[in-house]
């Protein structure tokens, strides 16, 4: 990684506050260490999806589980702002879906645009892994019907960034 450009950092939070680690094996029949919410820290702000695209100097609504430096970007902030405006309608309260359009999917779109990399599969694929369990199959259709109401952060309109939560399978 060169020293030029902005660092692209994935910030990972645990929406379960540790409960997934202690209860998932018994409940799901598989070990899930966290229920991840992600945001991307770049240009001095954290960009996340919660009811819409949001950004803040530092999110801080819950303790951070880990930070993953995914690379550097040479994309100017102005071009990134155009990207955000271009995807804003894809990431709204109405389009939120626990399994297919959550904070982790938004973060993935952002890091692909900025650095040409992806969010780690252990985060991005967690909903599919949970849906493969008997309990996941029982609950996911009900959760999917609830749509945007399932955004665990209960975010409202847009700010300008990425990442938003999703109980059971990530943000």
What does each model-identified segment do?
Residues 114-126:
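Short conserved catalytic/interaction loops centered on acidic-Pro-aromatic/His motifs
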Residues 1-101, 114, 130, 134-156:
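Non-catalytic ligand/cofactor/substrate-binding and regulatory segments of enzyme domains
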Residues 155-171:
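Intrinsically disordered, low-complexity regions enriched in glycine and serine
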